[in-house]
Amino acid sequence: MADVTVGIVVFPGSNCDHDTEYAVASFPGVKPVMLWHNDHDLKGCDAVILPGGFSYGDYLRCGAIARFSPIMREVIDFAGKGRPVLGICNGFQVLVECGLLEGALIRNAGRRFVSRQTTISVANNATIFTDRYQKGEVLRVPVAHGEGNYYASPETIESLESNGQVVFRYTDAWGNATAEANFNGSMNNIAGIVNKQGNVLGLMPHPERASEKLLGSEDGRRLFESLFAHLAGA
């Protein structure tokens, strides 16, 4: 794989930045670069990841303050040029707050923070983030959030579905999008979406926490592999 540089944005309150750094660095030829929230430069990165955590303490709303960070102006411009941006958990929340992705992430239906292993299925494998998966493949990936309930207008949901922008869904172990599997109440069991251009992905589950056998699952690793292979032209 050709050399690839991946920026990982660190906000005050981020707590998955080093987990993400570890997962990224495990790929030969891929170099993680930490980007501070006050930076005005993406340092020549080929892709940007917004990691999980509680940016700015989740005051006002999850991701509501982080969207105004200086670094986000650069990320928005970067995404506008068609460059890859990945938002994980709190990173997904930041992406919807700044308008790079549609919809909103609201309080879980059960009104509780949920931290556990979950199963999701690949709804669309024709993206730069998922082409190493099979469509319909079921993955074991952990979640840890209190506001991961994906919500959007009926028109937006219809558009996301018809355009193939729903990338991951909460399902049971057999790939069925049941009410029981939809622990946070997300519309249409949505766990992750991509923008119309296909270069910005947000998901609530944590692929970096499912990147090696020691963690109980390697199912998240191929998301990174898909992205890095795309960047390297492999």
Curated annotation (Swiss-Prot):
InterPro entries documented for this protein: Class_I_gatase-like, PRibForGlyAmidine_synth_PurQ
Domain Glutamine amidotransferase type-1 positions: 5-234
Record's keyword terms, sorted: ATP-binding, Cytoplasm, Glutamine amidotransferase, Hydrolase, Ligase, Nucleotide-binding, Purine biosynthesis
GO MF, one annotated term: glutaminase activity
Pathway(s) this gene product operates in, as recorded in its UniProt entry: Purine metabolism; IMP biosynthesis via de novo pathway; 5-amino-1-(5-phospho-D-ribosyl)imidazole from N(2)-formyl-N(1)-(5-phospho-D-ribosyl)glycinamide: step 1/2
BP terms from Gene Ontology: 'de novo' IMP biosynthetic process
Any one GO CC term of the record: cytoplasm
Subcellular location: Cytoplasm
Keyword set includes DNA damage: no
Pfam families: GATase_5
Role this protein plays: Part of the phosphoribosylformylglycinamidine synthase complex involved in the purines biosynthetic pathway. Catalyzes the ATP-dependent conversion of formylglycinamide ribonucleotide (FGAR) and glutamine to yield formylglycinamidine ribonucleotide (FGAM) and glutamate. The FGAM synthase complex is composed of three subunits. PurQ produces an ammonia molecule by converting glutamine to glutamate. PurL transfers the ammonia molecule to FGAR to form FGAM in an ATP-dependent manner.
HAMAP family membership: PurQ (MF_00421)
Subunit-level organization: Part of the FGAM synthase complex composed of 1 PurL, 1 PurQ and 2 PurS subunits.
Protein name: Phosphoribosylformylglycinamidine synthase subunit PurQ
Organism expressing this protein natively: Chlorobaculum tepidum (strain ATCC 49652 / DSM 12025 / NBRC 103806 / TLS)
